């Protein structure tokens, strides 16, 4: 079985290495950066191809000789990548988090009879899978709350935050209206709104605020009340609101000293050195998914907790582990014919397949990514 991983950045590299550990899979990584490809080649028995994903037809040509693909490209390239992979008639598991609605490609995917598993990371991804699983065990699911964040272990003033990707992606989370489900209706709320403090054993108190992370859950799950909130150290949301309301996240150019500049570009340029995760710096991922409902006439609640830390042995960030392993495990199951949903498949459908769900959780556990279930 020949698999091509499209994009070999931080997460794509982890996916490729995990897939390559399976002796039955022949793995190739593709990226526009020779440096990124060489970094993965030094760490795993894979092949490399230079591909410029922005060129029309490049993805279609790249996947033509492979049995399936994995998508790990930047979000702005994600939708076109999916489209070209589907046009080539290949299965794909994707983490690219494209802003467009991937369900628009469902008819094409069904026509081509391919499996297209999208948003298959940690959040979206495992958050949806856990929600889908818990809801499927109930006679009636009434609410779903997803709390998730990636944070540095050491807190450095003023932002107490670190990233491993472009700050523009994070800023987008802070300006895009958050869609939540309230009493069966989709309601838009300001990002960074409704801040609340939440305690996590072993970590302490974090703050949670509204972000637009429900995505496909808003359409696929018949749960009348759903929300997704991002977790940060307390005080972060207020700082971000101050920047946003002052105009630092604005996309309309302003003239300064005779030069026009977009405030958001300047802000990202200034924040990146302060936010960038340093080499070897410890970080962790924390997530809590809570689904409440009724079973046999009684109230029931399923809670899933994850706390995952930087892996010092492999020098792998928690965000790359929790995102990449979910994707690589599901890619392996698709490759082996154990998950065969045709068309565009949001991750919550994985949770509704109890056999696949249990395999996924067990494989994650083997890699040290453990979701603790509590039923009450």
Indicate residue ranges for each PLM-predicted region.
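Conserved N-terminal Rossmann-fold NAD(P)-binding element of oxidoreductases
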Residues: 3-7
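N-terminal Rossmann-fold NAD(P) dinucleotide-binding loop
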Residues: 12-13
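Helix N-cap at the beta1-alpha1 junction of Rossmann-like dinucleotide-binding domains, i.e.
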Residues: 33-36, 99
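Beta-loop-alpha module in the N-terminal Rossmann-like domain of NAD(P)-dependent dehydrogenases
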Residues: 68-85, 98-102
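Rossmann-fold NAD(P)-binding glycine/threonine-rich loop
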Residues: 95-118
């Amino acid at each position: 079985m020949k698999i091509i991983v499209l994009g070999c950045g931080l997460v794509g590299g982890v996916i490729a290495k995990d897939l390559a550990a399976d002796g039955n899979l022949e793995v190739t990584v593709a990226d526009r950066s020779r440096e990124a490809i060489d970094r993965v080649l030094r760490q795993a028995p894979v092949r490399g191809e230079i591909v410029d994903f922005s060129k029309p037809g490049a993805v279609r040509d790249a996947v033509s000789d492979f049995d399936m693909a994995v998508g790990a490209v930047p979000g702005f390239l994600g939708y076109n990548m999916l489209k070209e992979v589907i046009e080539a008639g290949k299965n794909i598991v994707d983490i690219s988090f494209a802003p467009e609605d991937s369900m628009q490609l469902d008819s094409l995917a069904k026509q081509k009879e391919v499996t297209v598993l999208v948003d298959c990371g940690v959040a979206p991804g495992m958050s949806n899978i856990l929600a889908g699983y818990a809801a499927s065990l109930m006679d009636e699911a009434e609410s779903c709350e997803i709390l998730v964040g990636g944070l540095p272990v050491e807190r450095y003033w003023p932002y107490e935050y670190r990233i491993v990707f472009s700050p523009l992606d994070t800023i987008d989370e802070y300006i895009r209206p958050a869609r939540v489900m309230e009493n069966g209706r989709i309601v838009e709320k300001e990002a960074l709104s409704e801040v609340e403090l939440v305690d996590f054993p072993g970590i302490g108190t974090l703050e949670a605020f509204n972000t637009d992370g429900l995505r496909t859950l808003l359409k696929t799950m018949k749960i009348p009340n759903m929300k997704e909130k991002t977790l940060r150290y307390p005080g972060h949301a207020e700082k971000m609101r101050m920047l946003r309301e002052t105009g630092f996240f604005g996309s309309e150019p302003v003239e300064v000293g005779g030069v026009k500049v977009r405030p958001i570009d300047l802000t990202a340029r200034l924040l990146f050195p302060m936010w960038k995760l340093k080499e070897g710096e410890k970080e962790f991922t924390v997530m809590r998914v809570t689904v409440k409902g009724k079973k046999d006439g009684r109230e029931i609640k399923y809670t899933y907790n994850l706390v995952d830390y930087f892996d010092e042995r492999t020098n792998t960030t928690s965000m790359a582990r929790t995102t990449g392993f979910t994707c690589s495990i599901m890619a392996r199951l698709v490759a082996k014919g154990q998950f065969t949903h045709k068309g565009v498949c949001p991750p919550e459908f994985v949770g509704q397949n109890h056999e696949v769900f249990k395999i996924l959780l067990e494989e994650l556990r083997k890699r040290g990514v453990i979701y603790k279930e509590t039923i009450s």
